[in-house]
From Swiss-Prot:
Phosphotyrosine modification, residue list: 239
Acidic residues bias spans: 160-169
Any one GO molecular function term: identical protein binding
PROSITE patterns noted in UniProt: PX (PS50195), SH3 (PS50002)
SMART domains xrefs: PX, SH3
Subunit-level organization: Homodimer, and homooligomer. Heterodimer with SNX18. Interacts with ITCH. Interacts (via SH3 domain) with TNK2, WASL and ACTR3. Identified in a complex with TNK2 and clathrin heavy chains. Identified in a complex with the AP-2 complex, clathrin and DNM2. Interacts (via SH3 domain) with DNM1 and DNM2. Identified in an oligomeric complex containing DNM1 and SNX9. Interacts with FCHSD1. Interacts with ADAM9 and ADAM15 cytoplasmic tails.
Tissues of expression: Widely expressed, with highest levels in heart and placenta, and lowest levels in thymus and peripheral blood leukocytes.
Modified residues (N6-acetyllysine): 288
Assigned GO CC terms: clathrin-coated pit; clathrin-coated vesicle; cuticular plate; cytoplasm; cytoplasmic vesicle; cytoplasmic vesicle membrane; cytosol; extracellular exosome
Protein name: Sorting nexin-9
Database matches in Pfam families: BAR_3_WASP_bdg (PF10456), PX (PF00787), SH3_2 (PF07653)
Length: 595
């Protein structure tokens, strides 16, 4: 009898990931409980099949009755975890932000149905972005042989972090940036990743905001901005506003993953060696350190720069060789992205992450980063464009143009991911089997011919046999080929999917600031602000616009380089693949003489 399971939490599938949308209380049939990576395959009453997080369902008894059981739930431990105090706090936070959950996993839902009018109109941008916030982890076992295709499909939910913080790591966030703010505005979307509450119950990630972002008025209406020590200049180049790039660039090599343990072996983890190419001096970091860096970058720069989430960690089977290889590959890609960004790579927190000399220096730098006041919208106070102020109409047009392009690109990237996933499944499943069937059929025919006893057909029978073996070889080539070309195309698209998922929140911050400026006339009329305050607001929104344009120019230059490189590689490998097949077929053909 097929195993049944009751869905414990709502789960919204992402396009292109072979996932199945399920709702709390729904009964599904488990068709494959051993997918791996914290996933199982299920079928709903409509006959639709797809992946569902293991911890989102409860296995029902064999009689099919839905009764409470402490012994058969896949998520028993998750249920017990929910009783912890940390979960109680997270649940309280989730309840207070419940209005932001309804938009699901599509960060562009508010863009498609945007409101107009008052200041709250852009609140819909609070949908969880896939890249910097609600995007589920991008990392799972690199199980190439699975029927579900490319490993990016297994974007499992964040699991309980058994790689707990050491005692030397601060508990509560010390930065004032994490304090609740009643002035959270359109830019106050909860961009934080589930890692902020990774020790709590494994429920839908978008129920836990990572932080509460102060409203843009903190920046726009500040009477006098302090002169920060750090400056982020913006210049006007051939293609418009741009960040100032350092004279020498560097990359960071992530290598040598090693398994470590603590507490007499009760806790285990993977540690990576990071070597910046500009110093060639290595430092070691565990995954939780990467997680800390991601959070600090998101908090500090997330209002202006897209910070894609890390490949998430996994608990079950996380030390499998293929999984470690895949996660290291994606950590490498993430670090390379950060190194290539002229603002991120030069930031104090990033440099400290790569160049600390000892434990004391690491702890000091860590605490300093967590107390950084120039975070969120206040990052714009450090930016100095070398250009005249823009008028509000132009600012709004630039913002709309960025929103439209990133939304359209997000759709295009998801479509390519979906098509690529389907193609991967065909290449690793049905297609090789068809070639194998042809090969076996030809060899069977040759065996039948050989049984005739006729002396003059030996050459023909041998040729048919070799042709059959050729098709079996082609089957193997077809099954292996996606790892040589499609994999890299999928990974590139997956990276950009993460980037694009950050933009609704960034655009929301800018749209909110624009709305504030539009309201300034009323505030001046009612003597709530002065005319000078209004002029300061316009100037500061202009700075925000220059920052957005500079970031988009950086984004476009990287996009052109990346897609040119990855599609060129894909086509080169495809040409080589078909040439190899053609050569094998020519060799098989040469055994058949013209008669």
């Amino acid at each position: 009898m097929a195993t049944k399971a009751r869905v414990m939490y709502d789960f919204a599938a992402e396009p292109g990931n072979n996932e199945l949308t399920v709702n709390e209380g729904e009964i599904i049939t488990i068709t494959n409980p051993d997918v791996g990576g914290g996933w199982l395959e299920g079928r709903n009453i409509k006959g639709e099949r797809g992946l569902v997080p293991t911890d989102y369902v409860e296995i029902l008894p064999s009689d099919g009755k839905d009764q409470f059981s402490c012994g058969n739930s896949v998520a028993d431990q998750a249920f017990l975890d929910s009783l912890s105090a940390s979960t109680a706090q997270a649940s309280s936070s989730a309840a207070s932000n419940n209005h932001q959950v309804g938009s699901g996993n599509d960060p562009w839902s508010a863009w498609s149905a945007s409101k107009s009018g008052n200041w709250e109109s852009s609140e819909g941008w609070g949908a969880q972005p896939e890249g910097a916030g609600a995007q589920r982890n991008t990392n799972t076992p690199n199980n190439w042989d699975t029927a579900f295709g490319h490993p990016q499909a297994y974007q499992g939910p964040a699991t309980g972090d058994d790689d707990d913080w050491d005692e030397d790591w601060d508990g509560p966030k010390s930065s004032s940036y994490f304090k609740d703010s009643e002035s959270a505005d359109a830019g106050g979307a909860q961009r934080g990743n589930s890692r902020a509450s990774s020790s709590s119950m494994k429920i839908p990630l978008n129920k836990f905001p990572g932080f509460a972002k102060p409203g843009t008025e903190q920046y726009l209406l500040a009477k006098q901005l302090a002169k920060p020590k750090e400056k982020i200049p913006i210049i006007v180049g051939d293609y418009g506003p741009m960040w100032v790039y350092p004279t020498s660039t560097f990359d960071c090599v992530v290598a040598d993953p090693r398994k470590g343990s603590k507490m007499y072996g009760l806790k285990s983890y993977i540690e990576y060696q990071l070597t910046p190419t500009n110093t060639n001096r290595s430092v070691n970091h565990r995954y939780k350190h990467f997680d800390w860096l991601y959070e600090r970058l998101l908090v500090k720069f997330g209002s202006a720069i897209p910070i894609p989430s890390l490949p998430d960690k996994q608990v079950t089977g996380r030390f499998e060789e293929e999984f470690i290889k895949m996660r290291m590959e994606r950590l490498q890609a993430w670090m390379t992205r950060m190194c290539r960004h002229p603002v991120i790579s030069e930031s104090e927190v990033f440099q400290q992450f790569l160049n600390f000399r000892d434990e004391k220096e690491w702890k000091t730098g860590k605490r300093k980063a967590e107390r950084d006041e120039l975070a969120g919208v206040m990052i714009f106070s450090t930016m100095e464009p070398e250009a005249p102020d823009l008028d509000l109409v132009e600012i709004e047009q630039k913002c709309e143009a960025v929103g439209k392009f990133t939304k359209a690109m997000d759709d295009g990237v998801k479509e390519l991911l979906t098509v690529g996933q389907e193609h991967w499944k065909r290449c690793t499943g049905p297609l090789p089997k068809e070639y194998q069937k042809i090969g076996k059929a030809l060899q069977s025919l040759a065996t039948v011919f050989s049984s005739s006893g006729y002396q003059g057909e030996t050459d023909l029978n041998d040729a048919i046999t070799e042709a059959g073996k050729t098709y079996e070889e082609i089957a193997s080539l077809v099954a292996e080929q996606p790892k040589k070309d499609l994999h890299f195309l999928m990974e590139c698209n997956h990276e950009y999917k993460g980037f694009l998922g950050c933009f609704p929140d960034i655009i929301g911050t800018h749209k909110g600031a624009i709305e504030k400026v539009k309201e300034s006339d009323k505030l001046v009329a009612t003597s709530k602000i002065t005319l000078q305050d209004k002029q300061n607001m316009v100037k500061r929104v202009s700075i925000m616009s220059y920052a957005l344009q500079a970031e988009m120019n950086h984004f476009h230059s990287n996009r052109i380089y990346d897609y040119n490189s990855v599609i060129r590689l894909y086509l080169e490998q495809q040409v080589q693949f078909y040439e190899t097949i053609a050569e094998k077929l020519r060799q098989a053909l040469s055994r058949f003489p013209v008669m």
